[in-house]
Design a protein with these regions (language model features):
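PLP-dependent enzyme catalytic core of the Aspartate aminotransferase-like
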Residues: 163, 172-215
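Helix C-cap/helix->beta junction micro-motif
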Residues: 20-21, 137, 178
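Conserved glycine-rich beta-strand-loop-beta hairpin in the small C-terminal domain of fold type I
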Residues: 106, 121-134, 141-158, 184-188
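Hydrophobic residues in well-ordered beta-strands that form the structural core
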Residues: 27, 57, 182-184
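Conserved core segment of the aminotransferase class I/II
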Residues: 48-124, 128-134, 213
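Active-site phosphate-binding strand-loop segment of PLP-dependent enzymes
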Residues: 1-40
Length: 215
């Protein structure tokens, strides 16, 4: 729900625990190219120090190149036993390998790191812009985003002059009264920055100001 990172120390502790307790370890590193911290590490960098660990890390092509919507192809790396089992399962369930997309991703990774970096900067700026707007309108971040393009917010106790009982209620009130659509679950709301936030800055600000939220 909110892009976060794991550093080397955290992965080392996790690998050691899983190794000692015979636990298989999988990490979905889909958003690694959209991480906004130099402390960000990957499981692949650490797991090789644990030769008996059964592990695997997955990477999504769509996110590796910035946000290539529809580029549904990925890559995995890991211990031979884990990869072997995944090959058995995926080989009997997938529709097949999309070679043109795989080739395109390789070209982007090898020849257009500047383009990928530009998307990373763009999403980071959008996250900052949206967070600033919503916080100025009284919304409360659940956690600061450190990767990806999602923001996670606590559900207000009051909005539009009435008490709010759930994130679902608040989301539907926002949709009905302002047209702003979020994703509600548990007691949180998620808002993405996949569109040009600056272009809709005024509309977003007006929407959340009209909500008159409080906690």
């Amino acid at each position: 729900p909110s892009g976060q990172i794991a550093d080397t120390e955290w992965f080392h502790t996790l690998c050691q625990y899983c190794d000692e307790n015979n636990i298989r370890l999988f990490n979905d590193a889909a958003y690694i190219s959209l991480s906004y911290s130099d402390d960000c590490s990957t499981l692949s960098e650490i797991a090789t120090d644990f030769p008996n660990l059964s592990w695997c890390e997955g990477f999504t092509a769509a996110k590796l190149i910035g946000n290539g919507t529809g580029w549904h192809i990925g890559a995995m790396v890991g211990s031979s036993d884990f990869i072997g089992d995944l090959k058995e399962v995926k080989g009997k369930s997938d529709a097949g390998f999309v070679a043109p997309m795989a080739a395109g991703v390789l070209v982007a990774l090898e020849e257009d790191q500047e383009g990928i970096a530009a998307y990373k900067i763009m999403y980071k700026q959008r996250l900052s812009t949206l967070s600033g707007i919503m916080e100025n309108c009284g919304m409360r971040l659940a956690i600061e985003p450190r990767a990806g393009f999602y923001t996670l917010w606590e559900t207000p106790k009051r909005a539009f002059g009435e008490m709010i009982s759930s994130s679902e209620e608040f989301n539907f009130l926002m949709i009905e009264n302002t047209g702003v659509v979020g994703v509600h679950f548990s007691n949180y709301l998620r808002y993405a920055v996949c569109a040009d936030v600056d272009a809709m800055r005024d509309d977003v600000e007006i929407a959340f100001k009209n909500a008159q939220v409080s906690y």
